[in-house]
Amino acid sequence: MPELPEVEIVRQSLDKKIRQKKVKKVIIRNRNLRIKIPINFKKKLENKKVSKVSRFSKYLIINFYKGDFCIIHLGMSGTIHLIRDNFKSSLTNLSFYNSPLLPKKHNHIEIIFDKFRIIYNDPR
């Protein structure tokens, strides 16, 4: 499990990359994570602009304008990856468990922006 300073580094890095960016599409591959993802999750995020990425304890919070938000907890083995849309290279691996090739079956959520996407990957 990442410690608090590691989560803060992920927050800072994520904030630099996605602040003021608009979500084009959300892909949910697994709704049954620690907390079941709500049915309206995609609708709440798609076509919304990120205002900032904040943190409460070890929870990452992607804040959107007009009050919507997305809460992420990395758990024991979760990672966040920023991947260019052509999938040929990673912009940033916001993980301390570097894995260049993500097993697709563990890519639970993708948040797609204009030229890149965020992938939440967790083998647990």
Where are the predicted features?
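Structured catalytic/nucleic-acid-binding cores of DNA maintenance enzymes
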Residues: 1-124
